[in-house]
């Protein structure tokens, strides 16, 4: 299984295009195969690999995806500096829990205040939907807040369910997360301003408008 996945990548069947991104999904993948694949890909930060209950998802992000991800992180870190909020950026690090059969590589993630094993905030840029529930993965990992940037809109979720439960009891339709309009981790962040600046293609203009809105 791992060898065939590696051959798929080596054969460039997952392309790195400008506007399109590809998703490869395989079921019945063992945890060992998942970890072996991560080890094979450790020097290639381009791919995002997610795992849930034996289903493996490899995403090859488009250039547009990476542009949005970079701009999002850039603006958010400007907010942290402006408000003197201590943070630890963890980028697209791999987080996994063998006992809970879950693993993810977010587009961006952060610890707030101090370094932790699991980030407080995970952010996903969604241009193409996969079949794995990212919220269920993040619930099992214990990530407190998850943001999705989709169709020029930010969707925010805060964990209400006990991540130790086998299945979500609170807010089961959204895997234990409540949909929120204001970040509970970063209540000072003006979401409307953030969204508006993320749609500005010129990064300098986006930063200027965002910083003006912060002042």
Ranges and model annotations:
Residues 51-53, 90:
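Short Gly/Ser/Thr- and Asp/Glu-enriched loop/turn motifs at secondary-structure junctions
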Residues 49, 146-147:
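His/acidic/aromatic-lined binding-pocket segments of jelly-roll/cupin-type domains
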Residues 2-19, 74-78, 85-141, 148-215:
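C-terminal interaction segment
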Residues 53-56, 61, 65-73:
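Nuclease catalytic cores
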Residues 1-50:
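Polyampholytic, low-complexity intrinsically disordered segments
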Residues 40-45, 80-88:
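Short secondary-structure junctions
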Residues 22-26, 60, 64, 195-202:
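A general boundary/transition motif marking the beginning of the first structured unit of a protein
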Residues 30-33, 64, 68-71, 130:
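Short amphipathic alpha-helical segments
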